[in-house]
Swiss-Prot record:
Belongs to the TPX2 family. GO terms for cellular component: cortical microtubule. It comes from Arabidopsis thaliana. Keywords: Coiled coil, Cytoplasm, Cytoskeleton, Microtubule. Residues 27-38 have a biased composition (Acidic residues). One of its GO terms (biological process) is multidimensional cell growth. Pfam families: TPX2 (PF06886). This is Protein WAVE-DAMPENED 2.
């Protein structure tokens, strides 16, 4: 029994040793890492201190330059005397420009209005011409009636043309009393004239 207990203790001790060794190695690594981080932090602190000192020196230089510039500006202000000047207003120029702009705008509006009126008149004329043409086309055009619809006038009979009579001078009786011989001769002449007339009429 004693041997078994001793062996178990010895085995436990050997196991503990085996387990203790890696713990020590890990602690050594942590210590080395801490040393490295401390060295890095020291170097960074040193660099930051250098940067701070440089910034402080720059600020000091800027403050000195500001003081110098303020002093020089004060000297210049004391040496120069400002004279009051009346303000320059550009209202007249602006009014002229505004007037020109409004004038151009008005001309543009007038041109557009004239163009619109002209376009309306042209459209109205075109519509009236189209309406007139349509009315002309809608009218019924009468064709001429054929000749056989007309009644011809009756035929006039031809008149015979008779020869013209020859005028004769009338014989005036100067004396109321006529002798027998004169009466016979006059009656004979009248008979001959009447015969001639009848022959001409036939």
């Amino acid at each position: 029994m004693r041997r078994e207990v001793f062996e178990s203790v010895s085995t436990n001790a050997s196991n503990e040793r085996v387990h203790v060794a890696p713990k020590i190695a890990a602690e050594e690594q942590d210590y080395e890492e801490k040393e490295c981080t401390e060295e890095n932090s020291l170097s960074q602190n040193h660099k930051s201190s250098n940067v701070i000192t440089e910034n402080d020196s720059k600020k000091k230089n800027l403050d000195e330059e500001d003081d110098c510039s303020v002093a020089s500006s004060m000297k210049n202000a004391k040496s120069k005397v400002t004279h009051g000047t009346a303000p320059r207003f550009r209202s007249a120029q602006r009014a002229e420009k505004r007037k020109e702009y409004y004038q151009k705008l008005e001309e543009k509006h007038q041109a557009l209005e004239a163009e619109r009126i002209e376009l309306e008149q042209r459209q109205k004329e075109e519509q009236e011409a189209a309406i007139k043409q349509l009315r002309k086309n809608l009218k019924f055009k009468a064709n001429p009636v054929p000749d056989f619809y007309y009644q011809r006038p009756p035929v006039k009979p031809e008149l015979k043309k008779f020869p013209l009579t020859r005028p004769k001078s009338p014989k005036l009786n100067l004396s109321r009393r006529k002798s027998c011989s004169d009466a016979i001769t006059s009656s004979g002449e009248e008979n001959s004239n009447s015969q001639n007339r009848q022959s001409v009429v036939e």
